[in-house]
UniProtKB/Swiss-Prot annotation:
It comes from the Bacteria. InterPro entries: CheY-like_superfamily, Sig_transdc_resp-reg_C-effctor, Sig_transdc_resp-reg_receiver, Tscrpt_reg_LuxR_C, WalR-like, WH-like_DNA-bd_sf. GO terms for biological process: regulation of DNA-templated transcription. The gene is rre1. This is Response regulator Rre1. It holds the Pfam family GerE. Transmembrane segments: none annotated. GO terms for cellular component: cytosol; protein-DNA complex.
Length: 231
């Protein structure tokens, strides 16, 4: 079973804290830690990093806007999703919240199901953004590796072209895919150039791996360059 997702709820009303905590934890998907004010919340954040913060706006000493501004000024919390709970539903209040950096507003009294839906949506978006960032970094790394391999061709201490140790018989389409992979293109870009589906490109790349005895795009390009199978 997956670990519950950690959330932080900041509200000076004990009844709100207890009811929201009980509702969100009922699904088993969340663990909700509590803070009665912004100062407690800030102290908590020095030792824990929740996936999302739910905060009241009208609190004593430090209000929700000031708390959020402090979060956004700290590099550790700039991308931390924040949902505001508020009895102040005026447009100006919402604008101030969004300008300060909140991700969603929910006016009191609210339906707990709506709060849960907002929380799940924000967490899903954050995960998608994180995945996209990781994928982008991975693609950039592959591109740099391929570029470095090409620069080694012909260098005294680099890659030297030799005949392939095995007989290879690529179809015209496989050769086209190999050439484009060697340019650093990914499956979606190759599919667009060849006017085919990404699924078909995946099949061709898989066949190229099998025929060349390689297991990754970088290995495939190294093999192809080393044996003069592509430029």
């Amino acid at each position: 079973m997956a670990e519950p997702i950690s959330l932080l709820l900041v509200d000076d009303e004990p009844g709100v804290r207890e009811s929201v905590q009980a509702f969100l934890e009922d699904s088993g998907d969340f663990k909700v830690d509590l803070a009665a004010n912004a100062t407690e919340a800030w102290d908590y954040l020095q030792h824990h990093l929740p996936a999302l913060v739910i905060s009241d706006i009208m609190m004593p000493q430090v209000d929700g806007y000031q708390f959020l501004q402090k979060l956004r000024e700290d590099a550790r919390f700039q991308s931390l999703p924040v949902v505001f709970l508020t009895a102040r539903g005026m447009t100006g209040d919402r604008i101030q919240g969004y300008q300060t950096g909140c991700d969603a507003f929910l006016s009191k009294p609210f339906d707990p199901d709506e709060l849960e839906a907002i929380v799940r949506n924000l967490l899903a978006r954050q995960q998608a953004s994180s995945d996209a960032g990781s994928e982008s970094a991975k693609l950039q790394e592959i591109y740099q590796e391929i570029r470095a391999l090409k620069e080694q061709i012909g260098q005294p201490s680099g890659i030297h072209t030799t005949p392939s140790p095995i007989k290879l018989d690529f179809t015209p389409r496989e050769q086209s895919v190999l050439d484009l992979v060697s340019q650093g293109l990914m499956n979606k870009e190759i599919a667009a150039q060849l006017k085919t589906s990404v699924r078909n490109v995946e099949k061709y790349v898989s066949r190229l791996f099998t025929k060349t005895g390689t297991n990754s795009r970088t290995e495939l390009v190294r093999f192809a360059l080393q044996h003069g199978l592509t430029e």
